[in-house]
């Protein structure tokens, strides 16, 4: 990712409706489908590609977290947190920091689309999941939405649920849940991505925090999805989410 993308993330990750709503949904999935199924009081969790650390406080609610990030700038701007250790690492070939370690939950949130060798990345993660452990992933949806926003973020591709599910199955994972999130607001998101194609290459719609009232409304609408995720699988949305077992 470009440096300016990380800088923008640092400015918005605590308040932007998209970051907040996504964390709430992912926390619900972990609580209902991972944490409640184990007898241990704390999980051992690995997040690869943690960026500037926006998901780490949410993950730390469920156990001890090891976070890996390739970019030095992003890693250096993650504040210290109890129960969280941070190291340099990347996929598929940069997991030396967790060599020989296995985890109850491995997380990859909006990372796989940044990796050219996505199948190799998924294969490498399998070596770090304990028997009975889980892999939780999100990726950007629909290649037809690929545009300026993706180029700014350094994406190689977008996925459909079917393509993503089959990719994980080929690497030996059992898919426990597959669906889309950001479904209620998807029409607005699709319009914004199409609009980006008529803007300059250096800008993307929706990266700034909207005015307070609008930001609160969008967060409330996005958060409604916690009522059905991970029980129901909605057939469309801005992101694909998969929960896999090994």
Please tell me what each predicted stretch does.
Residues 7-12, 135-157, 161-169:
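Short, glycine-/aromatic-enriched active-site segment of Class I SAM-dependent methyltransferases
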Residues 60, 79, 116, 130, ...:
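Short conserved AdoMet
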Residues 110, 114:
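A short His-aromatic
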